[in-house]
Amino acid sequence: MTDGNQKPDGNSGEQVTVTDKRRIDPETGEVRHVPPGDMPGGTAAADAAHTEDKVAELTADLQRVQADFANYRKRALRDQQAAADRAKASVVSQLLGVLDDLERARKHGDLESGPLKSVADKLDSALTGLGLVAFGAEGEDFDPVLHEAVQHEGDGGQGSKPVIGTVMRQGYQLGEQVLRHALVGVVDTVVVDAAELESVDDGTAVADTAENDQADQGNSADTSGEQAESEPSGS
């Protein structure tokens, strides 16, 4: 018994489409118009353009990723160096009190010889190698960034210049970081310009010359008087 809805074996129900890709119509003999996208060369050109655009896009993405990684690496190295500097500064800061004791011993003459002198020299050499620099000496210009004034002599008037007169405690600097300010006493000194100093020197020289001339004239007068007294009278 056969189902009425069942199609014969010869008819599968699929439609077969046949495309005539001949450029010349066999019936009319005319050249058929083919769209650019349907031409064999047009498809290859479009694929090549698309590939170039994709390569350019991926290249730009790669360059951005490389730039981001380079910036990240720089930041990581900078942060690592900053952490190392902070750790080094923390350790060195704890040794500043030892340096103060050694400085007092040096002023008392206790470091002229002996094992303590060797220890002090080695410690100074090691800290200097790390970049530790001491500052604050008598006669230096006062710098509020480096020095802390606990005494001040002078009125600080116009033309005066503050200099360090007394050092109570040395300051220390590690690289560009100030570990401890120097405690100093400040003295105001008068600044004299070179031209003003030269004019003062010239005036002093003129005054000295005038005094010498007056002294010479006085000596000449005394000599003439003595000669007149020593001559016999004519009577």
Swiss-Prot record:
Main location per the UniProt record: cytoplasm
Acetylation found in the keyword field: yes
A Gene Ontology term for the protein's cellular component: peptidoglycan-based cell wall
Keywords: Acetylation, Chaperone, Cytoplasm, Stress response
Region: Disordered, residue numbers: 1-50, 198-235
Membrane-crossing residue ranges in chain numbering: none
Domain of life: Bacteria
UniProt KW Chaperone keyword: yes
Gene3D superfamilies in the cross-refs: 3.90.20.20, Head domain of nucleotide exchange factor GrpE
Localization (cell): Cytoplasm
Alphabetical list of CDD domains matching this protein: GrpE
SUPFAM superfamilies in alphabetical order: Coiled-coil domain of nucleotide exchange factor GrpE, Head domain of nucleotide exchange factor GrpE
A single MF term (Gene Ontology): unfolded protein binding
Its job: Participates actively in the response to hyperosmotic and heat shock by preventing the aggregation of stress-denatured proteins, in association with DnaK and GrpE. It is the nucleotide exchange factor for DnaK and may function as a thermosensor. Unfolded proteins bind initially to DnaJ; upon interaction with the DnaJ-bound protein, DnaK hydrolyzes its bound ATP, resulting in the formation of a stable complex. GrpE releases ADP from DnaK; ATP binding to DnaK triggers the release of the substrate protein, thus completing the reaction cycle.
Family named by the database record: Belongs to the GrpE family.
Name used for this protein in its record: Protein GrpE
The organism of origin for this protein: Mycobacterium tuberculosis (strain ATCC 25618 / H37Rv)
Lineage: Bacteria, Bacillati, Actinomycetota, Actinomycetes, Mycobacteriales
